[in-house]
């Protein structure tokens, strides 16, 4: 654990590290939970620690088995709607917001704007990674309160079978960019009976670590 923590501190941009500690550690985990407990009594209902929302149903990929493609690209939350969700959430003590889709980075300008306006909150996007570029990394460093989970289904053959030719290389490039810029990110792994051995292998974990990943979520195919 100490090796992990030391590497995280050494390789993370100072502003990003500070914002993560303040927003996720203090605001969400400490101050927010105190407010949540009070609001549960006031409203006599459960209040979650985080809110998950889909900025858009649009996606630049068409992955095998993904339900998002069935919804097309016309379902979108406006910036004002997302802003309202976060504003109301903060009143209840919620300071952590996750975004899925679709591909949330189709709306990356609005997401950055949201991070900027609510700079005491932590934001996290589940993304395919193909829209990550240096300009976006610069914006992530500037706001400091946005992290990513990048989808990866295993090694090149398995990943590109589901996501399309060339996506594996784009994902590794995105991971390298994020790592070089001192940004915090992890991976989202969808496992099936076909890739389970690969995505639980030491070689796969070594690949994630080599390219700067800090954590991994594992989901079964739904």
Functional labels for PLM-detected ranges:
Residues 82-99, 107-220:
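Radical SAM/AdoMet-radical enzyme domain recognition
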Residues 69-73, 155-157, 222:
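A short, flexible beta-alpha/helix-coil linker loop
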Residues 1-135:
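Conserved alpha-helical substructure of the radical SAM core
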């Amino acid at each position: 654990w100490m090796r992990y923590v030391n590497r995280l501190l050494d390789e993370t941009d100072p502003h990003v590290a500070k914002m993560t500690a303040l927003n996720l550690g203090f605001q969400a985990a400490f101050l927010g939970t105190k407010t949540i407990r009070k609001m549960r009594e006031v409203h006599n209902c459960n209040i979650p620690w985080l809110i998950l929302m889909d900025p858009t149903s649009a996606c630049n990929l068409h992955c095998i088995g993904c339900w998002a493609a069935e919804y097309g690209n016309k379902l979108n939350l406006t910036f004002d709607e997302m802003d309202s969700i976060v504003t109301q959430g903060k009143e209840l003590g919620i300071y952590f917001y996750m975004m899925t889709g679709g591909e949330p980075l189709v709306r990356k300008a609005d997401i950055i704007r949201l991070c900027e306006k609510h700079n005491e909150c932590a934001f996290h996007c589940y993304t395919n990674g193909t829209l990550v570029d240096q300009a976006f990394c610069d914006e992530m460093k500037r706001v400091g309160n946005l992290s990513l989970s990048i989808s990866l289904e295993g090694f090149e053959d398995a990943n590109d079978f589901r996501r399309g030719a060339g996506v594996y290389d784009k994902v590794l490039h995105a991971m390298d960019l994020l790592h070089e810029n001192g940004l915090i990110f992890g991976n989202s792994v969808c496992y099936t009976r076909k890739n389970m051995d690969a995505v639980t292998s030491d070689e796969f974990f070594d690949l994630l670590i080599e390219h700067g990943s800090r954590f991994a979520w594992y989901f079964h195919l739904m």
